[in-house]
Protein backbone atom coordinates (compact mmCIF):
# COMPACT_ATOMS: atom_id res chain seq x y z
CA UNK A 1 0.00 0.00 0.00
CA UNK A 2 2.73 2.43 0.97
CA UNK A 3 4.56 1.91 -2.31
CA UNK A 4 1.39 2.45 -4.30
CA UNK A 5 0.64 5.71 -2.51
CA UNK A 6 4.20 6.88 -3.03
CA UNK A 7 4.08 6.07 -6.73
CA UNK A 8 0.84 7.98 -7.20
CA UNK A 9 2.24 10.95 -5.31
CA UNK A 10 5.44 11.19 -7.32
CA UNK A 11 3.76 10.49 -10.66
CA UNK A 12 1.14 13.18 -10.01
CA UNK A 13 3.79 15.71 -9.08
CA UNK A 14 5.88 15.09 -12.16
CA UNK A 15 3.39 14.26 -14.89
CA UNK A 16 2.54 17.83 -15.81
CA UNK A 17 6.08 19.11 -15.92
CA UNK A 18 8.69 16.49 -16.74
CA UNK A 19 7.33 13.51 -18.67
CA UNK A 20 10.82 12.06 -19.12
CA UNK A 21 10.92 11.32 -15.40
CA UNK A 22 7.82 9.15 -15.44
CA UNK A 23 9.42 6.01 -16.78
CA UNK A 24 12.28 5.65 -14.30
CA UNK A 25 10.40 6.92 -11.27
CA UNK A 26 7.01 5.34 -11.93
CA UNK A 27 8.71 1.93 -11.91
CA UNK A 28 10.38 2.43 -8.53
CA UNK A 29 10.04 -0.65 -6.35
CA UNK A 30 9.85 -0.50 -2.56
CA UNK A 31 10.15 -4.21 -1.81
CA UNK A 32 13.19 -6.07 -0.57
CA UNK A 33 14.50 -6.94 -4.01
CA UNK A 34 16.54 -4.80 -6.43
CA UNK A 35 15.07 -1.44 -7.39
CA UNK A 36 14.28 -0.90 -11.10
CA UNK A 37 15.52 2.62 -10.26
CA UNK A 38 18.83 1.42 -8.88
CA UNK A 39 21.03 3.96 -7.07
CA UNK A 40 23.64 3.67 -9.84
CA UNK A 41 21.04 4.79 -12.40
CA UNK A 42 21.16 8.37 -11.14
CA UNK A 43 24.42 8.64 -13.07
CA UNK A 44 22.42 8.41 -16.31
CA UNK A 45 19.72 10.95 -15.40
CA UNK A 46 19.46 14.07 -17.54
CA UNK A 47 19.39 17.63 -16.16
CA UNK A 48 15.65 17.71 -15.58
CA UNK A 49 15.58 14.27 -13.99
CA UNK A 50 18.31 15.30 -11.60
CA UNK A 51 16.69 18.59 -10.59
CA UNK A 52 13.47 16.76 -9.66
CA UNK A 53 14.94 13.44 -8.58
CA UNK A 54 17.39 14.98 -6.13
CA UNK A 55 14.49 16.47 -4.15
CA UNK A 56 12.43 13.28 -4.33
CA UNK A 57 14.56 10.51 -2.85
CA UNK A 58 11.93 9.58 -0.29
CA UNK A 59 9.52 8.94 -3.17
CA UNK A 60 11.98 6.93 -5.25
CA UNK A 61 13.97 4.88 -2.75
CA UNK A 62 13.37 3.38 0.70
CA UNK A 63 14.34 5.91 3.37
CA UNK A 64 14.17 6.37 7.13
CA UNK A 65 13.02 9.67 8.61
CA UNK A 66 15.37 11.91 10.59
CA UNK A 67 12.94 13.74 12.85
CA UNK A 68 13.14 17.40 13.80
CA UNK A 69 12.21 18.39 17.34
CA UNK A 70 9.89 21.04 18.71
CA UNK A 71 12.60 23.70 19.06
CA UNK A 72 14.39 25.20 16.05
CA UNK A 73 17.79 26.82 16.32
CA UNK A 74 17.29 30.34 14.90
CA UNK A 75 19.28 31.78 12.02
CA UNK A 76 19.08 35.57 12.06
CA UNK A 77 18.64 37.11 8.62
CA UNK A 78 21.17 39.85 7.88
CA UNK A 79 21.48 39.74 4.12
CA UNK A 80 24.27 41.05 1.97
CA UNK A 81 23.92 41.15 -1.84
CA UNK A 82 26.62 38.79 -3.05
CA UNK A 83 25.16 38.08 -6.49
CA UNK A 84 27.75 40.29 -8.16
CA UNK A 85 30.75 38.84 -6.33
CA UNK A 86 33.35 38.07 -8.97
CA UNK A 87 35.90 35.29 -9.25
CA UNK A 88 38.43 34.22 -11.85
CA UNK A 89 38.53 30.85 -13.52
CA UNK A 90 40.77 29.79 -16.40
CA UNK A 91 41.66 33.36 -17.26
CA UNK A 92 38.07 34.65 -17.30
CA UNK A 93 36.04 36.60 -14.76
CA UNK A 94 32.59 35.46 -13.65
CA UNK A 95 30.03 36.51 -11.04
CA UNK A 96 28.30 34.39 -8.43
CA UNK A 97 25.12 34.64 -10.50
CA UNK A 98 27.03 33.25 -13.48
CA UNK A 99 28.17 30.32 -11.37
CA UNK A 100 24.69 29.55 -10.03
CA UNK A 101 23.20 29.45 -13.51
CA UNK A 102 25.99 27.62 -15.31
CA UNK A 103 26.31 24.92 -12.66
CA UNK A 104 22.63 24.32 -11.96
CA UNK A 105 22.77 25.33 -8.30
CA UNK A 106 19.40 24.75 -6.64
CA UNK A 107 20.25 26.57 -3.44
CA UNK A 108 23.09 28.42 -1.74
CA UNK A 109 23.26 29.84 1.77
CA UNK A 110 26.05 31.80 3.41
CA UNK A 111 26.03 32.06 7.21
CA UNK A 112 28.50 34.09 9.26
CA UNK A 113 28.36 34.32 13.03
CA UNK A 114 24.95 32.64 13.03
CA UNK A 115 23.52 35.25 10.62
CA UNK A 116 22.30 34.48 7.11
CA UNK A 117 24.32 36.78 4.87
CA UNK A 118 23.04 35.40 1.55
CA UNK A 119 20.42 32.87 0.49
CA UNK A 120 19.25 32.05 -3.02
CA UNK A 121 17.08 29.29 -4.51
CA UNK A 122 16.70 28.13 -8.10
CA UNK A 123 15.44 25.11 -10.09
CA UNK A 124 12.02 25.37 -8.39
CA UNK A 125 13.59 24.83 -4.96
CA UNK A 126 12.87 26.81 -1.81
CA UNK A 127 13.59 26.87 1.94
CA UNK A 128 11.39 23.81 2.54
CA UNK A 129 12.94 21.71 -0.25
CA UNK A 130 14.55 18.53 1.05
CA UNK A 131 17.51 17.77 -1.24
CA UNK A 132 19.86 14.78 -1.30
CA UNK A 133 23.41 15.36 -0.06
CA UNK A 134 25.22 12.28 -1.40
CA UNK A 135 28.64 11.97 0.28
CA UNK A 136 27.97 14.75 2.78
CA UNK A 137 26.53 11.80 4.72
CA UNK A 138 30.09 10.56 5.24
CA UNK A 139 30.96 13.62 7.31
CA UNK A 140 27.76 13.19 9.31
CA UNK A 141 28.76 9.59 10.03
CA UNK A 142 32.11 10.90 11.26
CA UNK A 143 30.30 13.07 13.81
CA UNK A 144 28.14 10.12 14.86
CA UNK A 145 31.30 8.15 15.61
CA UNK A 146 32.29 10.99 17.91
CA UNK A 147 28.89 10.80 19.60
CA UNK A 148 29.26 7.03 20.01
CA UNK A 149 32.63 7.53 21.70
CA UNK A 150 31.15 10.18 24.01
CA UNK A 151 28.29 7.79 24.84
CA UNK A 152 30.72 4.96 25.62
CA UNK A 153 29.61 2.69 22.79
CA UNK A 154 33.08 2.85 21.21
CA UNK A 155 36.16 3.02 23.40
CA UNK A 156 38.31 5.00 20.96
CA UNK A 157 39.55 5.35 17.40
CA UNK A 158 42.45 2.94 17.95
CA UNK A 159 40.02 0.06 18.48
CA UNK A 160 40.12 -2.64 15.79
CA UNK A 161 36.87 -2.64 13.87
CA UNK A 162 36.61 -6.41 14.34
CA UNK A 163 35.84 -5.70 18.02
CA UNK A 164 32.46 -4.35 16.91
CA UNK A 165 31.98 -6.38 13.73
CA UNK A 166 33.47 -9.87 14.30
CA UNK A 167 32.19 -10.94 10.88
CA UNK A 168 35.18 -9.05 9.43
CA UNK A 169 37.71 -11.22 11.27
CA UNK A 170 40.11 -13.05 8.98
CA UNK A 171 39.29 -10.93 5.93
CA UNK A 172 40.71 -7.83 4.28
CA UNK A 173 39.84 -5.65 7.28
CA UNK A 174 41.60 -7.74 9.92
CA UNK A 175 43.86 -5.37 11.87
CA UNK A 176 42.20 -2.17 10.59
CA UNK A 177 41.34 0.40 13.27
CA UNK A 178 38.35 2.70 13.53
CA UNK A 179 40.67 5.62 12.81
CA UNK A 180 42.05 4.02 9.66
CA UNK A 181 38.51 3.39 8.46
CA UNK A 182 37.57 7.04 9.08
CA UNK A 183 40.70 8.18 7.22
CA UNK A 184 40.05 5.75 4.33
CA UNK A 185 43.50 4.30 4.86
CA UNK A 186 42.62 0.64 5.41
CA UNK A 187 44.87 -0.41 2.53
CA UNK A 188 42.05 -2.43 0.96
CA UNK A 189 41.55 -1.97 -2.79
CA UNK A 190 38.43 -0.17 -4.05
CA UNK A 191 37.34 1.38 -7.35
CA UNK A 192 35.35 4.63 -6.98
CA UNK A 193 34.65 5.14 -10.71
CA UNK A 194 31.16 6.50 -11.28
CA UNK A 195 31.14 5.83 -15.04
CA UNK A 196 32.37 2.22 -14.92
CA UNK A 197 29.51 -0.25 -14.33
CA UNK A 198 32.06 -2.87 -13.25
CA UNK A 199 33.68 -0.66 -10.61
CA UNK A 200 33.20 -1.60 -6.97
CA UNK A 201 31.05 1.47 -6.33
CA UNK A 202 28.54 0.17 -8.90
CA UNK A 203 28.67 -3.49 -7.87
CA UNK A 204 28.39 -3.09 -4.10
CA UNK A 205 25.38 -5.03 -2.73
CA UNK A 206 22.55 -3.12 -1.04
CA UNK A 207 21.89 -5.65 1.71
CA UNK A 208 24.18 -5.19 4.67
CA UNK A 209 25.49 -8.76 5.16
CA UNK A 210 26.34 -9.31 1.47
CA UNK A 211 27.89 -5.81 1.54
CA UNK A 212 30.13 -6.74 4.48
CA UNK A 213 31.11 -10.00 2.78
CA UNK A 214 31.88 -8.16 -0.48
CA UNK A 215 34.12 -5.67 1.31
CA UNK A 216 36.06 -8.22 3.33
CA UNK A 217 36.71 -10.32 0.21
CA UNK A 218 38.48 -7.43 -1.55
CA UNK A 219 42.27 -7.74 -1.93
CA UNK A 220 44.67 -5.73 0.18
CA UNK A 221 46.96 -3.30 -1.64
CA UNK A 222 48.82 -1.69 1.27
CA UNK A 223 49.46 -1.96 4.98
CA UNK A 224 46.70 -0.32 7.08
CA UNK A 225 47.38 3.36 7.71
CA UNK A 226 49.86 3.83 4.87
CA UNK A 227 47.73 4.71 1.82
CA UNK A 228 44.62 6.85 1.22
CA UNK A 229 42.01 5.44 -1.15
CA UNK A 230 38.61 7.15 -1.38
CA UNK A 231 35.97 4.48 -0.84
CA UNK A 232 32.22 4.84 -0.45
CA UNK A 233 32.15 1.13 0.34
CA UNK A 234 34.42 1.75 3.29
CA UNK A 235 31.98 4.34 4.61
CA UNK A 236 29.13 1.84 4.30
CA UNK A 237 31.31 -0.53 6.31
CA UNK A 238 31.89 2.22 8.88
CA UNK A 239 28.12 2.52 9.16
CA UNK A 240 27.87 -1.20 9.88
CA UNK A 241 30.51 -0.86 12.61
CA UNK A 242 28.64 2.10 14.09
CA UNK A 243 25.27 0.32 14.03
CA UNK A 244 26.78 -2.72 15.73
CA UNK A 245 28.35 -0.53 18.42
CA UNK A 246 25.29 1.57 19.24
CA UNK A 247 22.66 -1.15 18.74
CA UNK A 248 20.47 1.24 16.78
CA UNK A 249 19.90 2.48 13.25
CA UNK A 250 21.78 5.55 12.08
CA UNK A 251 18.78 7.78 11.31
CA UNK A 252 17.38 7.44 14.83
CA UNK A 253 20.81 8.00 16.36
CA UNK A 254 21.26 11.11 14.21
CA UNK A 255 17.81 12.30 15.30
CA UNK A 256 18.62 12.01 19.00
CA UNK A 257 22.27 13.10 18.95
CA UNK A 258 22.32 16.01 16.47
CA UNK A 259 19.07 16.75 14.63
CA UNK A 260 16.89 17.50 17.65
CA UNK A 261 19.56 18.70 20.12
CA UNK A 262 20.88 21.26 17.64
CA UNK A 263 17.40 22.39 16.55
CA UNK A 264 17.10 21.42 12.90
CA UNK A 265 14.00 23.00 11.42
CA UNK A 266 12.64 20.15 9.28
CA UNK A 267 12.53 16.39 9.02
CA UNK A 268 15.18 14.86 6.82
CA UNK A 269 15.55 11.32 5.56
CA UNK A 270 18.31 8.79 4.96
CA UNK A 271 18.32 6.34 2.06
CA UNK A 272 18.24 2.64 2.95
CA UNK A 273 19.76 -0.29 1.13
CA UNK A 274 16.44 -2.15 1.31
CA UNK A 275 13.03 -1.42 2.75
CA UNK A 276 13.36 -1.42 6.54
CA UNK A 277 17.07 -2.15 6.21
CA UNK A 278 20.30 -0.34 6.94
CA UNK A 279 21.16 3.21 5.91
CA UNK A 280 23.69 3.84 3.15
CA UNK A 281 26.28 5.33 5.50
CA UNK A 282 28.32 6.68 2.60
CA UNK A 283 25.47 8.46 0.95
CA UNK A 284 22.17 10.11 0.69
CA UNK A 285 20.89 12.07 3.65
CA UNK A 286 18.26 14.51 2.39
CA UNK A 287 17.57 17.77 4.24
CA UNK A 288 16.76 21.44 3.72
CA UNK A 289 19.50 23.88 2.79
CA UNK A 290 19.26 25.70 6.12
CA UNK A 291 19.65 22.42 7.99
CA UNK A 292 22.78 21.67 5.96
CA UNK A 293 24.07 25.03 7.15
CA UNK A 294 23.18 24.05 10.72
CA UNK A 295 25.19 20.84 10.33
CA UNK A 296 28.13 23.05 9.41
CA UNK A 297 27.49 25.26 12.44
CA UNK A 298 27.30 22.20 14.69
CA UNK A 299 30.66 21.00 13.37
CA UNK A 300 32.18 24.48 13.63
CA UNK A 301 31.06 24.73 17.26
CA UNK A 302 32.79 21.48 18.15
CA UNK A 303 29.65 19.40 18.57
CA UNK A 304 27.71 21.34 21.20
CA UNK A 305 23.89 21.25 21.33
CA UNK A 306 21.71 24.35 21.23
CA UNK A 307 21.32 24.27 25.02
CA UNK A 308 25.09 24.20 25.53
CA UNK A 309 25.37 20.51 26.39
CA UNK A 310 28.20 18.62 24.75
CA UNK A 311 27.38 15.93 22.17
CA UNK A 312 30.83 15.17 20.77
CA UNK A 313 34.06 14.76 22.77
CA UNK A 314 35.80 18.13 23.26
CA UNK A 315 38.63 17.26 20.89
CA UNK A 316 36.60 15.33 18.31
CA UNK A 317 36.22 17.96 15.61
CA UNK A 318 39.86 19.02 15.98
CA UNK A 319 40.93 15.41 15.47
CA UNK A 320 38.41 14.93 12.64
CA UNK A 321 39.78 17.90 10.73
CA UNK A 322 43.48 17.17 11.28
CA UNK A 323 45.44 15.96 8.24
CA UNK A 324 45.79 12.20 7.85
CA UNK A 325 49.40 10.97 8.06
CA UNK A 326 49.55 9.91 4.42
CA UNK A 327 47.02 12.29 2.86
CA UNK A 328 46.99 15.85 4.26
CA UNK A 329 43.80 16.77 2.39
CA UNK A 330 41.57 14.42 4.36
CA UNK A 331 40.61 13.89 8.00
CA UNK A 332 37.89 11.67 9.49
CA UNK A 333 35.52 11.69 6.48
CA UNK A 334 36.07 15.45 6.08
CA UNK A 335 37.92 17.19 3.24
CA UNK A 336 40.47 19.72 4.48
CA UNK A 337 40.91 23.13 2.87
CA UNK A 338 43.27 26.08 3.25
CA UNK A 339 43.35 28.27 6.36
CA UNK A 340 41.83 25.72 8.70
CA UNK A 341 38.62 25.34 6.68
CA UNK A 342 37.05 21.93 6.09
CA UNK A 343 34.22 20.60 3.95
CA UNK A 344 31.64 17.88 3.48
CA UNK A 345 31.33 17.24 -0.24
CA UNK A 346 28.86 15.24 -2.35
CA UNK A 347 28.71 14.43 -6.04
CA UNK A 348 26.77 16.74 -8.36
CA UNK A 349 27.87 19.79 -6.38
CA UNK A 350 26.59 19.22 -2.84
CA UNK A 351 28.64 21.13 -0.28
CA UNK A 352 28.98 22.20 3.34
CA UNK A 353 32.10 24.39 3.69
CA UNK A 354 33.15 25.46 7.18
CA UNK A 355 35.67 28.20 8.04
CA UNK A 356 35.97 28.30 11.85
CA UNK A 357 38.49 31.14 11.85
CA UNK A 358 36.01 33.51 10.19
CA UNK A 359 32.82 31.83 11.50
CA UNK A 360 31.55 31.20 7.95
CA UNK A 361 29.47 28.29 6.68
CA UNK A 362 28.55 27.98 3.00
CA UNK A 363 26.13 25.26 1.90
CA UNK A 364 25.09 24.44 -1.65
CA UNK A 365 22.58 22.09 -3.22
CA UNK A 366 23.24 21.48 -6.90
CA UNK A 367 22.44 19.36 -9.93
CA UNK A 368 25.73 19.58 -11.81
CA UNK A 369 25.75 18.22 -15.38
CA UNK A 370 28.01 15.37 -14.21
CA UNK A 371 28.90 13.70 -10.94
CA UNK A 372 32.09 15.71 -10.76
CA UNK A 373 35.33 16.71 -12.45
CA UNK A 374 38.46 18.68 -11.67
CA UNK A 375 37.04 21.63 -13.59
CA UNK A 376 33.71 21.62 -11.73
CA UNK A 377 35.42 21.25 -8.36
CA UNK A 378 38.02 23.90 -9.15
CA UNK A 379 35.41 26.44 -10.14
CA UNK A 380 33.39 25.63 -7.01
CA UNK A 381 36.37 26.33 -4.76
CA UNK A 382 37.12 29.55 -6.64
CA UNK A 383 33.60 30.86 -6.01
CA UNK A 384 33.66 29.73 -2.35
CA UNK A 385 36.90 31.64 -1.79
CA UNK A 386 35.45 34.74 -3.46
CA UNK A 387 32.31 34.60 -1.31
CA UNK A 388 34.33 34.24 1.89
CA UNK A 389 36.52 37.19 0.94
CA UNK A 390 33.48 39.37 0.21
CA UNK A 391 31.72 38.45 3.46
CA UNK A 392 34.83 39.13 5.51
CA UNK A 393 35.33 42.49 3.81
CA UNK A 394 31.78 43.53 4.66
CA UNK A 395 31.87 42.32 8.25
Predicted regions and their residues:
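N-terminal leader/targeting segments and the immediately adjacent pre-domain N-terminus
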Residues: 10, 23-125, 151-154, 209, ...
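Active-site-proximal loop and beta-strand segments within enzyme catalytic domains
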Residues: 83-99, 126-128, 137, 148-227
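Active-site SXXK
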Residues: 114, 131-157, 181, 238-242, ...
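Active-site Gly/Thr loop motif
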Residues: 265-267, 314-362
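Short, small/polar residue-rich loop motifs at catalytic or cofactor-binding pockets
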Residues: 102-105, 129, 347-348
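Active-site-proximal alpha-helical segments within enzyme catalytic domains
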Residues: 234-241, 281-304, 350-367
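Active-site helix/loop module of the DD-peptidase/beta-lactamase fold
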Residues: 132, 151-189, 217, 246-282, ...
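Catalytic-site signature segments of enzymes, centered on catalytic residues
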Residues: 121, 127-128, 195-276
Amino acid sequence: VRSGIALVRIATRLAATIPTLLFPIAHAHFGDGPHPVAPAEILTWNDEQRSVGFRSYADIFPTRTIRAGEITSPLVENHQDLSGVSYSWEGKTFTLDDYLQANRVAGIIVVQGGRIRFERYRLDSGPSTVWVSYSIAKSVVSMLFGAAIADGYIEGVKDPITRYLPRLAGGAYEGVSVEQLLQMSSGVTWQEDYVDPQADVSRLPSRILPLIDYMQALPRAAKPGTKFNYSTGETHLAGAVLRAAIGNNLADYLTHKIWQPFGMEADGNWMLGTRGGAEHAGCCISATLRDYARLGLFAMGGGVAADGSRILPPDWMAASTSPSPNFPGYGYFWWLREGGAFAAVGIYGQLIWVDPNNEIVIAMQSAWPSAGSRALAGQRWAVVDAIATAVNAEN
